[in-house]
């Protein structure tokens, strides 16, 4: 089953007009913005990195091929008071040449998740990003060394060859999301990193300052234009050891906007299982243990103060578990700063629209 791409290859514009949307995206409410980045509405809710390398190894056929990965999840627009939208995700794997004439399929996974976060962080430095409001497109410029250095700084070291392979996977894997339950079903199809332009060794020898560039997903550009992103603690995210702990952190950072001692965040096991795609064990007890480990990592990093859980039973059978998460004061302060930034940015953009600044 092939997933088609919506448009032909593009090249980045030579220049774009300065715009308030990109300026706001790169402006953080903090004395030190180096540890901050942005969560992206919808994009970060898509469980596109959920298939582990171990699962991929078990799923490949004798020709090293993988099927299209299919998963359902729910997405609730944080800026709208509406019911959750049921979504169907398809991920077409990338076919990577691992040795001359030999190709192996890969789904995007943990390494690609981390590199995406690094690229978004690099993009937030205006020296390395370009954003067109009218064209709804965003470009990032980078070198392999920039990515490697940032990953090492954050305790997630990868070799140059590993980074190059991840970029190839991101530039080939196709993500399709179908939004269901509507009179007219909407479908979004895109690469994780479009129009990737690479620097070869000969290119580097001729121009050591030459850079790679790629186009970020249209959903990211749309979020920048509409101010539906949120400031969050990028340093904390990158310090977390597992995909599930990072999933919790980003979900809390984007959705838990009323964080406080009197307002715990509640989430069910079934919701975690459906929306993260990261509970891979056949036994529920093993998956519950993974959740406990992930949540305790958030306690260690002052995201959560404490957690409690309540089993929902049908007779002797556990049918679901409700987790009640209490925010740490440090996280509450971060959420308040993110809320203040969002209010300020919306006010600023409304003034731009009225022509008052």
Model-derived regions: residue spans:
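Charged, alpha-helix-forming regions
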Residues: 1-357
């Amino acid at each position: 089953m092939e997933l088609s791409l919506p448009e032909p290859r593009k090249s980045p514009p030579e220049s774009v007009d300065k715009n308030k949307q990109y300026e706001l995206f790169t402006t953080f409410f903090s004395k030190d913005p180096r540890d901050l980045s942005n969560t992206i509405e919808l994009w970060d809710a898509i469980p596109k990195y959920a298939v582990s390398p171990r699962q991929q190894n078990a799923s490949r056929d004798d020709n090293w091929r993988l099927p299209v990965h299919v998963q359902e999840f729910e997405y609730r627009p944080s800026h709208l008071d509406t019911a959750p939208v049921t979504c169907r995700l398809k991920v077409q794997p990338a076919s990577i040449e691992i040795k001359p004439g030999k190709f192996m399929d890969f789904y995007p996974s943990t390494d690609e998740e981390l590199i995406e976060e690094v690229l978004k962080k690099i993009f937030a430095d205006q020296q390395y990003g370009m954003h067109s409001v009218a064209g709804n497109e965003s470009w990032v410029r980078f070198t392999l060394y920039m990515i490697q250095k940032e990953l090492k700084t954050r305790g997630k070291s990868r070799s140059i060859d590993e980074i190059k392979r991840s970029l190839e996977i991101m530039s080939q894997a196709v993500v399709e999301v179908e939004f269901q339950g509507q009179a007219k079903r909407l479908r979004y199809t895109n690469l994780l990193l479009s129009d990737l332009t690479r620097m070869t060794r000969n290119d580097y020898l001729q121009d050591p300052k030459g850079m790679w560039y790629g186009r970020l997903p249209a959903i990211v550009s749309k979020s920048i234009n509409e101010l539906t992103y949120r400031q969050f603690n990028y340093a904390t995210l990158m310090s977390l050891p597992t995909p599930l702990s990072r999933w919790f952190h980003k979900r809390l950072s984007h959705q838990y906007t009323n964080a406080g001692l009197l307002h715990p965040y509640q989430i069910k096991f079934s919701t975690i299982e459906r929306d993260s795609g990261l509970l891979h064990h056949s036994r529920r007890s093993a998956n519950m243990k993974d959740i406990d480990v992930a949540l305790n990592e958030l306690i260690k990093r002052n995201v959560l103060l404490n957690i409690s859980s309540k089993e929902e039973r049908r007779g002797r059978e556990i049918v679901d578990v409700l987790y009640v998460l209490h925010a740490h004061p440090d996280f509450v302060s971060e959420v308040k700063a993110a809320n203040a930034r969002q209010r300020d940015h919306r006010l600023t953009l409304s003034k731009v629209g009225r022509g008052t600044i």
